[in-house]
C-alpha cells in the first residue's frame, strides 16, 4: 500500500486498521440485533478515525485530545469484548485484547510525547497527614 497521508505512517494507525479487520471477522457470526455488535463496530471504527484526525491537527492540545479519544474508544472496545464473553457470544477475546493493549500503549506514548502543554501532577497522599505535619 502506498502511503499518501502522514497518519498512515503511524504504527498505531496500522494496528488500529488490523483491529478493525479482526472485529469484522468476529462480528460476522454475532447477531446484528445485539446492541454490543453495533457498539463494537462503531468504537473500533472510531480508533483510526480519531488517530487520523488528531495527527492532522496543528496544536499539541488538539492532537492529544483526539489521541485520547482514540484511546477511550480502544478501552470501550475491550469492554465490548468482555460483554460478548459474558453473554456467551464468544468464548474468549484474548487475541483482540492483545491488539488493543498494543494500541493503547502506543496511544499513551503519543499522548505523552505531544503533551508538553499539559501540567502533570505528582501523585499526592490524599486524606492523610504525615506525622507532625502542621502541628
Segments predicted by a language model, with ranges:
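Short, C-terminally biased terminal segments at protein or domain edges
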Residues: 1-135
Amino acid at each position: 500500500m502506498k502511503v499518501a497521508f502522514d497518519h498512515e505512517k503511524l504504527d498505531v494507525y496500522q494496528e488500529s486498521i488490523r483491529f478493525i479487520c479482526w472485529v469484522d471477522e468476529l462480528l460476522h457470526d454475532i447477531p446484528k440485533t445485539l446492541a454490543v455488535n453495533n457498539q463494537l463496530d462503531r468504537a473500533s471504527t472510531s480508533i483510526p478515525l480519531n488517530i487520523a484526525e488528531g495527527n492532522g491537527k496543528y496544536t499539541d492540545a488538539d492532537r492529544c485530545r483526539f489521541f485520547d479519544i482514540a484511546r477511550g474508544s480502544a478501552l470501550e472496545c475491550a469492554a465490548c469484548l468482555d460483554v460478548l464473553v459474558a453473554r456467551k457470544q464468544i468464548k474468549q477475546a484474548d487475541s483482540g485484547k492483545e491488539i488493543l493493549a498494543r494500541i493503547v500503549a502506543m496511544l499513551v506514548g503519543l499522548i505523552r510525547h505531544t503533551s508538553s502543554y499539559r501540567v502533570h501532577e505528582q501523585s499526592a497522599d490524599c486524606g492523610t497527614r504525615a506525622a507532625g505535619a502542621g502541628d
